[in-house]
Amino acid sequence: MSFKKQAAALMAAALCVTGAGCSRSAENSGNTGDTVNTDGTVSDGGSAREFDTELTAMQLTSDIKIGWNLGNTLDATGGSGLTQETSWGNPAVTPELIQAVKDAGFNAIRVPTTWERQIGDDGTISADWMSRVQQIVDYAYDLDMYVILNMHHEEWYQPYADKEEEISAKLSSCWTQIAENFKDYDQHLIFEGMNEPRWKNTDYEWNGGNDEGRTVVNHLNKAFVDAVRATGGNNQYRFLMVCPYAANSACRAGASGRRQAHRFGSRVHTLQLCACTARHG
């Protein structure tokens, strides 16, 4: 759809996070060696940037004023190796670009990233690709911008029940690696589990799906949340974004239950408004 890119950019500025934050639970506090400071921040002996555990989801959302979507770059699907970044015609991302975005008034950036072409036969993500993703994240993070990092044009997580076990294992493996790499980052880094998981090229692609597809998406959301939380460090408290089937605002997203509910939000976009505008000029 020609309006999808605009919708994605608008979505990045409107991080839809629901629920209230809460302090670190006793259940999670005994195994990591992390220190919860008297001001509510978390540190792990100095290597991690302090995570504000007192920050609620609604407070974080309010602090995100306007966001910018770095599209058609790390989410591109052409090229090989690091040339994937420029395979759709955009130049390589530079610190100057991100500085210009901040200077224009943006305080959040979404970094859509396609990992599929960078995963080896053994399931390991290319170290070079991980390093480049981290470098771009750091361009914004070091400017105290919020950064939303996701898995984007992945062909392998179409939510069919007979593929759920295989997809869930791969999703968990990928997010475990990503989360481990970024576990010391504070609340300015947000993970978005999937982008528009759906049955592609079917009658169910964009109409809200069916019970099977929606159920599998919710199970995959749980796998994502559990994988990130299990890596420990600041990922125990990280704000996570899950999406419903096809990221459709008419669907409901699910995750792993009450214990996780205080630090995740639903990422949706509405294309109907764009379609209506296009029809009526």
Task: Report residues per predicted region.
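Bacterial N-terminal signal peptides that target proteins for export
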Residues: 1-10
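N-terminal carbohydrate-binding accessory modules
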Residues: 30-108
